[in-house]
Amino acid sequence: MEKHITTPITQKITKDLRSGDYVYITGEMYVARDAAHKRMIEALDRKEELPIDIKDSTIYYMGPSPARDGRPIGSAGPTTATRMDKYAPRLLDLGEKAMIGKGKRSKEVIDAVIRNKAVYFAAVGGAGALLSKCIKSSEVICYDDLGAEAIRKIYVEDFPVIVVIDLSLIHISEPTRRVV
């Protein structure tokens, strides 16, 4: 099924998403990869506030190439999500509602998605140039010393993703296995 949604992504939205749905997202989301995730978890360990508003947020696992030709961002393809698996459950428990990446997730992440009524989307790997056309603005908001791995806030229009893990306990990456 094809769906169009806007951020922030809330439980009201996630409850209606099913594995295999084609979804087009419009709105603000964050971009962060493993180095930024590590720093966020270290900040939490030090009892510091996160540098982003995690409640009902969407984090796209991506490290963009430099912007060209007046575009807000360069190629913007997804990063392998397993690199964030050791950090994702804690952020989900704090209110993150959606993750975008590519590839499978660990059982711990799947459990956290279900527990927090969140969702994991996949973006098409190898389509970074095409995906970047959906990104209308991009701003580094913290950890700028990380370069391409800095946390960015982006605004997207009709950003195409596929639901991989939903709340039905069946996920597209292992369609014959029922997760309980």
Language model segments and positions:
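Single conserved hydrophobic/aromatic residue that forms the stacking wall/gate
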Residues: 131, 171-180
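Short, structured beta-strand/loop micro-motifs enriched in basic residues and often containing a Trp
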Residues: 1-9
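Long terminal accessory segments
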Residues: 156-169, 173
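Feature captures the catalytic cores and cofactor-binding loops of soluble hydro-lyases/lyases
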Residues: 31-32, 36-159
